């Protein structure tokens, strides 16, 4: 039985590392779970996000660097949605809404869940990794 103990400890340690790495990968998004007082000022998302010590940290991110407009629809990854989208607003603390100009010259209402775009990294709002972009390559048009 003692011969199994070191192998079991090694296996348990490896399993713990795998679980921790998976949970940290998921922690890159869903900023709304750990950020409060979130508001949108133009293209700047601001709020207080919990840091590694468990304390709130005032932080912001310029969404214009990470979100674009594809024919009247908000798109991530992308950039410069602000040049062709108007009436930007934040609903429910995590849903970006805007009216974006399409190829037809008309404006189309669009929305995007920012939990797939923004994460909390040690108290700082940061863009999600590109692998998470598969969830929101194109946003919904209403």
From Swiss-Prot:
Keyword tags: Disulfide bond, Lectin, Signal
Disulphide linkage map: 29-128, 35-49, 85-100
Q: State the signal peptide span.
A: 1-27
Q: Which domain of life is it from?
A: Eukaryota
Task: Write out the coiled-coil annotation as residue ranges.
Answer: none
Instruction: Enumerate the GO terms in the molecular function aspect.
Output: carbohydrate binding
Pfam families found in the cross-reference section? CVNH (PF08881)
PANTHER family from the xrefs? CYANOVIRIN-N DOMAIN-CONTAINING PROTEIN (PTHR42076:SF1), CYANOVIRIN-N HOMOLOG (PTHR42076)
Its job: Mannose-binding lectin.
Q: Which family does it belong to?
A: Belongs to the cyanovirin-N family.
Protein name listed in UniProt: Cyanovirin-N homolog
Species of provenance? Ceratopteris richardii (Triangle waterfern)
